[in-house]
Amino acid sequence: MRAAFLFLVVTVSTPLEAQQVTLDARTAQAIVAGCTAHAKAKKQSHAIAVVDVGGHLVAALRMDGNGSGIMDFSLAKAQAVAAWGFPTAEMEQAAKETPGFVNAPHVVTVAGGVPVWSADGKTRIGAVGASGEAPADDAACAEAGIAAAGLRTSRVR
């Protein structure tokens, strides 16, 4: 007896606007360049880390004048934002309001970690961590780098 099998292959096309947006190396380097330009204009020196949404390092730069541990701190800030989805500046308040939060993995309660959202503000694609100056200056550097790359620091609803 012969059996006949019919295989039906269905492909589904995802609309362009719904396709996955990722943080590539070229874009990460543009963020670093924008942050560096901002820092130089302010006569500051930062260590900058750019990670994807999984917290994996995509680009980094330690500007002249920073100590050896500063790069690690920048990466920790970026990875904290990748893990939690909100700026490190807000983690201090979250730690005050939520007992035990400060003991959770990847929590950094110092400003300088900022999320990276796609240009349309609909997809979180990574994070930037900057360290080496006052926390507010670190955050401003990260935000300037993100803006220079044509991306957003927050979601657009």
Give the positions of each predicted feature.
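N-terminal signal peptide c-region/cleavage motif recognized by signal peptidases
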Residues: 11-15
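Cleavable N-terminal signal peptides
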Residues: 4-6, 16
